[in-house]
Curated annotation (Swiss-Prot):
InterPro entries: Borrelia_lipo. It comes from Borrelia hermsii. A lipid is attached at C27 (N-palmitoyl cysteine). The Vlp and Vsp proteins are antigenically distinct proteins, only one vlp or vsp gene is transcriptionally active at any one time. Switching between these genes is a mechanism of host immune response evasion. Residues 1-26 form the signal peptide. A lipid is attached at C27 (S-diacylglycerol cysteine). One of its GO terms (cellular component) is cell outer membrane. Genes for both Vlp and Vsp families are on (usually) unnamed linear plasmids in B.hermsii HS1. This is Variable large protein 21.
Amino acid sequence: MRKRISAIINKLNISIMMMIVVLMIGCGQQPEAGKTGAAGGEKQGAGSLSEVLMEVGKSAENAFYSFLELVSDTLGFTAKSTTKKEDVGGYFNSLGGKLGEASNELEQVAKNSEAGIEKNDASKNPIRSAVNAAKKTLEALKGYLDSLGTVGDSNPVGWASNNAQGAAVDEAELKKAYKALKGIMDTAEGAGVARPEVGNIAVKVGNGTDNKDGAKILATDGAAAVGDAGKAAAILTTVSGKEMLASIVNSTEDKAVKITGNVTVETTPLEFAVGGNGAHLSQNANSKAAAVAGGIALRSLVKGGKLAADNNDDDKASQGVGITAANKLLVAVEDIIKKTVKNVLEKAKGEIDKARDPKPAGQQ
């Protein structure tokens, strides 16, 4: 009986040892975390941007995914009631820094392609040409983002005080913001991104509610009245961030001035951002909603800007309008940046693949 039990135990021990050996072999065949291998495969877009660009088998879409991974900790910034204008500046600087990193990755691709090539022949390298063209666009965008990073101050986004008049933005900083936004849009258009259309909706929509008094939160000569912040919020619901951005960049730098007469359908976001007399600002029911909304966004983001508010904690309502306008504009700018980078990487990837694709013997 004891011999039989001993034999059974020995067989169990042998079986357990064999299972352990099999498990150890299996574990040894697994790729390490974060690495690719025959046993693991590679996820779409994995690898650094430079690696994806240099691998002929990877698509342009993979390159864009690698870029999105690079900027994933920066994209999607949203201003809140506690967000300072300079915090938004930090977001712009961070996004610009990521474009700088992408540019460095591109440079690495060019350097790798030039290994073993005489300097005199390097200028004829199609990969270097493709990289230089892409870097030029990315560096231009970075410059404009860096500029946007300096136009704010330590006050909250959409800054407002209870039962108080608003304050005009610093005109020099407003011009800087305008130039940067226009530069981003022009660069994007040069890279094949469609320019957004300016919204034509007026502050009075058809025969419906007239929200022209919403412009009074941009008054610099007196507090807003009851309901003005609500009408400003209603104006924002009628326009998109893209329409606001288009309205801003379709302005001209010389429009960064105080409004001294009644507004018209031609009054620009830059003028609304500087503001003026409340009666002048709210005089025309045909003022463009995108212009008023763009002005609110700029007032909320640029140094010195402050929104007017009524009493009874109306400053919270005015600030809420400013934050909404600012976030709409930020989303539009970020979207334009992403589309531009996507187009740039697609073009660069195509040229790089063409240069590295093996040619038939007769075409060597």
